[in-house]
Amino acid sequence: MLDGPRLFRIIRSLLVSPAFRTLAVLGLGIIAVASAQPAWAGLEEAVKAMQAGDMAAAEKDLQVLVKERDPRAQFLLGTYVYGNPDSKMFDLNKAAPLLLDAAERGYIPAMIPLAGAYAEGKGVPKSMFESFKWLAIAERWNSPNSAGLLEQVGRELKPDELEKAKAAAIAFTFKTK
């Protein structure tokens, strides 16, 4: 029979064992993945709809996730549904705020199209400063293709503006809410 102190020692030895910690982390990971399944399913359905050319269905699937501020959904909706000139739902005034919110919260893929929107003044006020800032942030986080674009936009800024934009990029912190 197990008495209190002996049972306590057995439980304590289990809790500190590497195997238990591994199983606990694995269990938490499974719970996290299982709870994310509805979001993943919504993204998967939206991508299938976009591949089929059904932007209305893609928008419907993504809007549910956008309301939850899922940056992946914001990026897909902003880039491929509203930001795509070939889409019947093309509207840069809807695309830019989605990309901005995703980028401000750290979604790196949204930063390059957002920088392009600022450079061209489409959906947001034209600002080479903001364009450079977002490209510099993207480059700092190793976004592919950002270096060439950064150099190109940098040539459009005066030296003092360039330094201010670099400083703004370095000082930028991602929003958490």
Language-model segment annotations:
Residues 41-57, 61-64, 68:
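Alpha-helical segment of the N-proximal tetratricopeptide repeat
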Residues 53-54, 67-71, 83-85, 104-107, ...:
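Short helix-capping/linker turns of helical repeat alpha-solenoids
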